[in-house]
Structure formats: structure tokens, C-alpha cells
């Protein structure tokens, strides 16, 4: 099997990042916003792995492990916040919760 060209991989990473960014900006549900952030982090990790494989450096894989660890921590903290948010407001709509504050 041949290697994936850098341009093709970066196009996929850019599309994934754009989809995640779109999800963060458009969706108002806190859970979907959290999933969109995860997609954006995975797109960045994909770009690091591709760059590391093109230049035959292990730095891309090291950054992938770091981003994966950061994404796991962000998911745990984010889900805890989502649970508290739901218990307090009984919905996950970010705009409605900001209006309740006054």
C-alpha cells in the first residue's frame, strides 16, 4: 500500500475541522457543541500525524497522543458540565440558559 499524499490528507483534515467549526457556531445544543469540538481536535490530530509521516518524524505521533489525551480530558469535563447544566436548566440549549441569567 502506498502512502496518502499530504495534500489529500490535509484536505480531509480541513473538511473535518470546518464541519466541527460549523457545528460549534450553528448548533445551540451543548452536547452537539461538545461533539463538534471533538471533531475539530481529531482533525488537528490527523494533520499532525500526516505531517509527521511525510517528514518521517515521530513528532506527529507524539502530538497525536497529546491531543488524544487532551480530548479525553475535555470530554470528561465537558460531559460533567453538560450533566450539571441539564440538572439545573432541564434542557441543553445554550441561548435559553444565557437568557435565564438576566
From Swiss-Prot:
Question: What PANTHER family does this protein map onto?
Answer: NADH-UBIQUINONE OXIDOREDUCTASE CHAIN 4L (PTHR11434:SF16), NADH-UBIQUINONE OXIDOREDUCTASE SUBUNIT ND4L (PTHR11434)
EC annotation from Swiss-Prot or TrEMBL: 7.1.1.-
Transmembrane segments in this chain: where? 6-26, 30-50, 62-82
Bilayer topology reads: Multi-pass membrane protein
Look up keyword Translocase and say if it applies.
Answer: yes
Chief site of localization? membrane
* Catalysed reactions listed for this entry: a quinone + NADH + 5 H(+)(in) = a quinol + NAD(+) + 4 H(+)(out)
Q: Example GO molecular function term?
A: NADH:ubiquinone reductase (non-electrogenic) activity
Pfam families linked to this entry: Oxidored_q2
The biological processes this protein is annotated with in GO are: ATP synthesis coupled electron transport
Q: Which family does it belong to?
A: Belongs to the complex I subunit 4L family.
**Lineage of the species this protein comes from:** Bacteria, Pseudomonadati, Pseudomonadota, Gammaproteobacteria, Moraxellales
**Gene source species:** Acinetobacter baylyi (strain ATCC 33305 / BD413 / ADP1)
Q: Known InterPro entries for this protein?
A: NADH_UbQ_OxRdtase_chain4L/K (IPR001133), NUOK/Mnh_C1-like (IPR039428)
- Protein name, per record: NADH-quinone oxidoreductase subunit K
Q: How does it assemble?
A: NDH-1 is composed of 14 different subunits. Subunits NuoA, H, J, K, L, M, N constitute the membrane sector of the complex.
Q: Which UniProt keywords apply?
A: Cell inner membrane, Cell membrane, Membrane, NAD, Quinone, Translocase, Transmembrane, Transmembrane helix, Transport, Ubiquinone
UniProt cross-references to NCBIfam families, sorted A to Z? PRK05715.1-1, PRK05715.1-2
Report the subcellular localization: Cell inner membrane
> What cellular component GO annotations does this protein have?
NADH dehydrogenase complex; plasma membrane
Amino acid at each position: 500500500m502506498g502512502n496518502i499524499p499530504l495534500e489529500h490528507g490535509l484536505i480531509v483534515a480541513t473538511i473535518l475541522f470546518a464541519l466541527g467549526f460549523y457545528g460549534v457556531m450553528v448548533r445551540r445544543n451543548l452536547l452537539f457543541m461538545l461533539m463538534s469540538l471533538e471533531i475539530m481536535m481529531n482533525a488537528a490530530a490527523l494533520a499532525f500525524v500526516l505531517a509527521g509521516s511525510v517528514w518521517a518524524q515521530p513528532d506527529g505521533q507524539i502530538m497525536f497522543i497529546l491531543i488524544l489525551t487532551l480530548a479525553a480530558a475535555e470530554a470528561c469535563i465537558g460531559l460533567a458540565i453538560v450533566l450539571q447544566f441539564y440538572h439545573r436548566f432541564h434542557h441543553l440549549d445554550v441561548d435559553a440558559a444565557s437568557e435565564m441569567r438576566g
